[in-house]
Amino acid sequence: MPSYRTFSFGLAALFLSACAPLHQKTYLPNDPGIAWQERQAQLRQLTSWHIIGRASIAQDKKAWNAGVNWYENAGVYRIKMMGPFSQGGFHLDGTPEQVILTLSDGQTTSSSSPEALLNKTFNLNLPITALRDWLKGLPYAGDAPYENIEIDNHGRLKYLEQLRWKIYYQQYKRYGQQQLPSKLFMSHPELKVRLVVDNWKYEQ
């Protein structure tokens, strides 16, 4: 005949096994919402980075392809667009106070806004300021709330609507300790942009 102690242990084991699934479900370590919050905090700390990639830009019946080198260091940046892009390429050198646009022939012009320079010179409405966040897989942190957002099962940005742009994050790759966007498609009523990032470098 089984003893009272054996019965007690059996009942305790049954109780613990019944509770285990509920406990695991309550504290999901891979919850996308939690992962997204943690991911945002980590990516906001990436202030020094460099990407090498390619861009395809379509506006009306015109299209351009260019190589992209983007350097960012604590608010100071240099963006090089190389190849058959309008006048043969350009680069932007920006600080929080001023942005200088240099064309391939050496001609320069300056403004407080990179968007204003590109619009004036090339008639292109490229959201350079917001792209500094979008490229990392983050909503733009400026004074422009997003209209819609989707997160994938890994807590990564999948789709974003902000500043009249629709951004589709089509692929991520691991670079160092972070999974960062490697393919983006951006759609605007006036413009469409496809970006392929071949390499990400950043300071931990």
What kind of region is each of these model predictions?
Residues 39-60:
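A short, Trp-centered hydrophobic/proline-enriched beta-strand micro-motif
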Residues 137-204:
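Gly/Pro-enriched, hydrophobic low-complexity segments
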Residues 1-8:
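Bacterial N-terminal signal peptides that target proteins for export
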Residues 15-18:
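C-terminal motif of bacterial Sec signal peptides marking the signal peptidase cleavage site
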Residues 76-125:
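An acidic-aromatic
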Residues 59-63, 84-89, 189-192:
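Solvent-exposed loop/turn segments connecting transmembrane beta-strands
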